[in-house]
């Protein structure tokens, strides 16, 4: 259940379940979500089970796409709902 409205600066397709048309967020959208959630790269790494923030830097730098599972964790942490639920 979504508790906050989705930010207009992030495409609505980024909040769909994986099998229902999810679109991988752009680096700027990842940065926006992290700002909303008040997450540092280190905290985002810890939440998503990463060893360090290097991979998070790759996501927000556009070098590596963020996996749906990691994005879903960050979305829920930001209070925007459980997008993984079908």
Segments (PLM) and residue ranges:
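Secretory-pathway ectodomains
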Residues: 30-31, 48, 75-79
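DNA major-groove recognition helix of helix-turn-helix/homeodomain DNA-binding modules
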Residues: 64-86
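Short basic helix-loop element that most often maps to the first helix and adjoining turn
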Residues: 27-43
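N-terminal flexible/basic segments that precede or flank functional cores
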Residues: 1-23
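Residue-level marker of regulatory loop/turn positions in helix-turn-helix DNA-binding domains and
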Residues: 22-26, 63
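Alpha-helix N-cap/N′ positions at the starts of helices
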Residues: 25-28, 51
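Recognition helix of helix-turn-helix/homeodomain-like DNA-binding domains
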Residues: 42, 48-65
């Amino acid at each position: 259940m979504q508790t906050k409205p989705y930010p207009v600066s992030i495409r609505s397709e980024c909040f769909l379940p994986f099998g229902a048309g999810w679109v991988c967020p752009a680096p700027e959208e990842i940065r926006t979500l992290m700002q909303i959630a008040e997450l540092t790269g280190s905290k985002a790494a810890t939440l998503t089970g990463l060893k360090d923030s290097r991979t998070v830097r790759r996501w927000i730098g556009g070098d590596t796409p963020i996996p749906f599972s990691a994005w879903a964790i960050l979305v829920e942490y930001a209070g925007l709902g459980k997008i993984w639920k079908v």
